[in-house]
Amino acid sequence: MSITDVLSADDIAAALQECQDPDTFEPQKFFQTSGLSKMSASQVKDVFRFIDNDQSGYLDEEELKFFLQKFESGARELTESETKSLMAAADNDGDGKIGADEFQEMVHS
């Protein structure tokens, strides 16, 4: 699966443009601009599986660091503060990782 199978390349480019500078990544803005927030729950979970590098069923901080690069290989890494903020926004049960349901809830919140 390629991310452009479910999201428009133009929307992805626009979303990445908005957060190209360090410490400018805002999850909800990214989800809105990329079109992710308009997708169904099952489509969002498909994107989650694409982002889940090790197919563990969870996203950890290491995977979140490379979140933007899953949308475009040349995109920057998230900063440590952006990574921790993204984790805090989605990790509802406080286990230090984001499951598919938590990811979907964050995207649609």
Swiss-Prot record:
Organism: Cavia porcellus
Record key words, sorted: Acetylation, Calcium, Metal-binding, Repeat
Protein name: Oncomodulin
CDD domains: EFh_parvalbumin_beta (cd16255)
Modified residues (N-acetylserine): 2
Binding site residues for Ca(2+) 1: 52, 54, 56, 58, 63
Family: Belongs to the parvalbumin family.
Binding-site positions, Ca(2+) 2: 91, 93, 95, 97, 102
